[in-house]
Curated annotation (Swiss-Prot):
Stored InterPro entries: ATP-NAD_kinase_N, ATP-NAD_kinase_PpnK-typ_C, NAD/diacylglycerol_kinase_sf, NADK
Enzyme Commission number(s): 2.7.1.23
Binding site for NAD(+): D68, G69, N142, D143, R153, D172, T183, A184, Y185, S186, L187, S188
Reaction catalysed by this enzyme: NAD(+) + ATP = ADP + NADP(+) + H(+)
UniProt name for this protein: NAD kinase
Gene: nadK
Keywords: ATP-binding, Cytoplasm, Kinase, NAD, NADP, Nucleotide-binding, Transferase
HAMAP family: NAD_kinase
UniProt source species: Lachnospira eligens (strain ATCC 27750 / DSM 3376 / VPI C15-48 / C15-B4)
Length: 293
């Protein structure tokens, strides 16, 4: 690799010290490197960490400084470029980032001599329908989450798989995740840890009001449809403003969201796009899990 683009979480590297350190190292080795924070100074751009319009067409690798969240946001926003990503963690080593600032030189040396592997991660497409109209669509690397929006009550919904009714749930919400997302919100909700390159779709209810409702794993090419129902199980117990607050929300990777109402259908399928992560670290996925225990 010779052509690099650096995306920086400005909250974790506010002065750009780490960004400049990486850029200087790459340039000293004869590589070409463009930093988004330098572009922002030139074009006075603010907002999200990454902007697909600013990425040069000859970029071979996007280096993301921050944490797992920054890497997820960059992979979503730059997915149309089909460029591999590598994460440099500023803080505690996560599940997705490959290295940190203490060992970045060794990692970049591996990239420069083409000594690396590519992990291909499945993504999800989600569409929200109100009647026959599609009102919202987005993609997710980790998960699509449907839960309550403020009110302290459970929500009711039906789940269909490939058009076949699965079950009716009363819960705080539901998480539809990829294998990559199995170590995110789904794990906190009691879901299993899954090898991240596995191709599948996992459905995990959030605090279900039943003892026998657990995570279910489906094939990658299955279609998951969630239909929102009236919150009958909780409406009788609610009074005042909470009773009138029926807002529920669908969130994609914690980044974008859309409020949903009774009758809305959220259809989730495997995306045609994938995220490609560069892997140079000798730390295996199992070792990362072991270090978290």
């Amino acid at each position: 690799m010779k052509y690099f683009y650096i995306v920086t979480n400005r909250f974790k590297d506010p002065d750009g010290v780490n960004t400049r350190k990486i850029a200087h190292f790459l340039r000293s080795k004869g590589a070409e490197c463009v930093c988004q924070i330098e572009q922002e100074k030139a074009f006075n751009k603010t907002g999200s960490y990454s902007d697909v319009r600013l990425v040069p067409n000859n970029t071979e690798c996007v280096i993301v400084l921050g944490g797992d969240g920054t890497l997820i946001q960059a992979s979503r926003e730059l997915s149309e470029k089909d460029i591999p990503f590598i994460g440099v963690n500023i803080g505690t080593l996560g599940y997705l980032t490959d290295t940190d600032m203490s060992s970045f030189e060794e990692t970049l040396e591996s990239l420069l001599r083409d000594d690396y592997e590519i992990d291909r991660r499945m993504m999800l497409d989600g569409c929200i329908y109100r009647g026959e109209e599609r009102i919202f669509s987005d993609m997710a690397l980790n998960d699509v989450v449907i839960n309550r929006n403020g009110a302290l009550r459970i929500i009711d919904f039906d789940i269909y798989v490939n058009g076949e009714y699965l079950n009716t749930y009363s819960a705080d919400g539901v998480i539809v995740s990829t294998a990559t997302g199995s170590t995110a919100y789904s794990l906190s909700a009691g879901g299993p840890i899954i090898q991240p390159t596995a191709r599948l779709i996992m459905v995990t209810p959030i605090c279900p009001h039943s003892l026998n409702q657990r995570s279910i794993i489906f094939a990658a090419d299955d279609e998951i449809m969630i239909e929102m129902k009236d919150n009958k199980s909780s409406s009788g117990r609610m009074t005042g403003s909470l009773k009138n607050d029926s807002a529920r929300v669908a969130t994609f990777d914690g980044e974008s969201f859309c409020e949903v109402v009774t009758g809305d259908r959220i259809v989730i399928t495997q995306s045609e796009r994938i995220s490609r992560f560069v892997k140079t670290s000798r730390i295996s996925f199992l070792e990362r899990i072991r270090n978290k225990m």
